[in-house]
A protein has these predicted regions:
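Short beta-strand and adjacent turn/loop elements
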Residues: 1-147
């Protein structure tokens, strides 16, 4: 969901009592691509989603694998208070959009950013020193290890 509430820089909320919604990577339905390109992209996405689910088996708190919906408040009604999403973008775009500063080893290279968002208020919860990663698996592993 492209709409955000306030940006809150603080420690990540305690997720021990809450169910975390883990958003799957999106498949493409881009009509400008050939059928072969769409199938290849979607197969790659299926593999990413499988690996995402496997890696989350190491997460110690409650979570539910979900697909992204337009209105995130739907998840709130299902008992999911926070959403975990991995975003792929350029550092400058995320900094501009969220009005934050991000650490990244290679600032000109697009990377992966973990977005933790409250499902009802749409507030974005940020670490004191947000960071981007070159590999989505590293972003996910950092989240699992530190939350």
């Amino acid at each position: 969901d492209a709409k955000f509430g306030k940006k809150t820089v603080r420690q990540t909320p305690s997720l021990e009592e809450e169910t975390l919604g883990v958003v799957l990577f999106n498949k493409t339905i881009d009509s400008k691509k050939t059928t072969k390109e769409i199938l290849e992209y979607n197969n790659k996405t299926n593999l990413q989603n499988k690996k995402l689910q496997e890696m989350f088996l190491n997460y110690n708190n409650k979570y539910e694998i979900i697909e992204e919906r337009e209105d995130t408040r739907y998840y709130f009604t299902k008992g999911i208070k926070y959403m975990f999403t991995i975003i792929f973008s350029r550092k400058d775009l995320i900094e501009k959009y969220l009005n934050i500063k991000i650490e990244q080893e290679f600032p000109k290279t697009p990377g992966y950013f973990v977005l933790l968002q409250h499902t009802f208020s749409k507030n974005v919860l940020l670490k004191k020193k947000p960071k981007m990663y070159l590999q989505w698996e590293n972003a996910l592993q950092d989240f699992i290890t530190n939350h």
